[in-house]
Structures are given as structure tokens and as C-alpha cells.
Amino acid sequence: MIWKRKITLEALNAMGEGNMVGFLDIRFEHIGDDTLEATMPVDSRTKQPFGLLHGGASVVLAESIGSVAGYLCTEGEQKVVGLEINANHVRSAREGRVRGVCKPLHLGSRHQVWQIEIFDEKGRLCCSSRLTTAIL
């Protein structure tokens, strides 16, 4: 297990209240040994004008999961901030909930690199994202 902080799904979801995570109804669903998963609806809050999941919403989901995963790998008063994120949008989604799955690529003492893949309800890859964070 890579997590240094002990936390429940309920506590993770409570952290999103009153901010963008809560507004977009991003829900943390699973904490694995080295994965963190969350879902987000494809609805009026997250669609672009042509009825498809907005690429920016996918990036919000990816950075939200990756940043929380990064925080869970720190100790004490350490904080995590995003340095760089990229995303390749490979399939659109029109409805339902998308699922983001976050895994570490590198866990260093000063930087982390996370791979976040976002899937539609049929398990098809919609977006592949990589987030680099700094530990402060």
C-alpha cells in the first residue's frame, strides 16, 4: 500500500463540499492498494454546448483525483500542488457517469507523477491524463 494517510471514502467526499469537486458531483468511490477512483456525471454541469463531456471537465476530474492521491502519499503538514497536467481525449461521453482511475508513475520525495485514465460506463477509455505534483 502506498498511502501514508488513513482516510475513509466518506471523509474524502466531505472534503469536496463547497468547492469545485462538490459542484461537479465528483465522488470518490474506491481506495485500492495503489489506486484511487472517483466518478463524475456527464450532465449539464460537465457537458460542452454540443452535448459531449467537456475536455476541461475531464481535466478537473483527473487533477482532483491525482491531487488527492498525492496528498494521501504525504505525511504531517506536507501539502501537494499541481505543477503540470496534460490530457488526451480519445472518446466522447454523452451521458451517465465517467470513472477516473489514478495510479502512481513516480513517487519521489519532492515530486510525484500520476496517471489518470477516465472511462465511460461501458469501460471504454475516454481520456488519458498525466499529472505532475510538487510536495511542499
UniProtKB/Swiss-Prot annotation:
Stored InterPro entries: HotDog_dom_sf, MenI, PAAI_dom, Thioestr_dom
Recorded metabolic or biological pathway in which this protein acts: Quinol/quinone metabolism; 1,4-dihydroxy-2-naphthoate biosynthesis; 1,4-dihydroxy-2-naphthoate from chorismate: step 7/7; Quinol/quinone metabolism; menaquinone biosynthesis
Domain of life of the organism encoding this protein: Bacteria
Keyword Hydrolase: yes
Gene Ontology cellular-component annotations: cytosol
Effect recorded for H106A: Almost no change in catalytic efficiency toward benzoyl-CoA
Consequence when changing H54A: 514-fold decrease in catalytic efficiency toward benzoyl-CoA
Entries under Pfam families matching the protein: 4HBT
Reactions it catalyzes: 1,4-dihydroxy-2-naphthoyl-CoA + H2O = 1,4-dihydroxy-2-naphthoate + CoA + H(+)
Class of this enzyme: hydrolase
Alphabetized UniProt keyword annotations: Hydrolase, Menaquinone biosynthesis
Transmembrane listed as a keyword: no
Gene3D superfamilies for this protein: Hotdog Thioesterase (3.10.129.10)
Positions bound to substrate: G82, H89, V90, R91, S92, H106, L107, G108, S109, R110, H111
NCBIfam families: PRK10293.1 (NF007631), unchar_dom_1 (TIGR00369)
Assembly information from the UniProt record: Homotetramer. Dimer of dimers.
Membership in a protein family: Belongs to the thioesterase PaaI family.
Protein name: 1,4-dihydroxy-2-naphthoyl-CoA hydrolase
Encoding gene, per UniProt annotation: menI
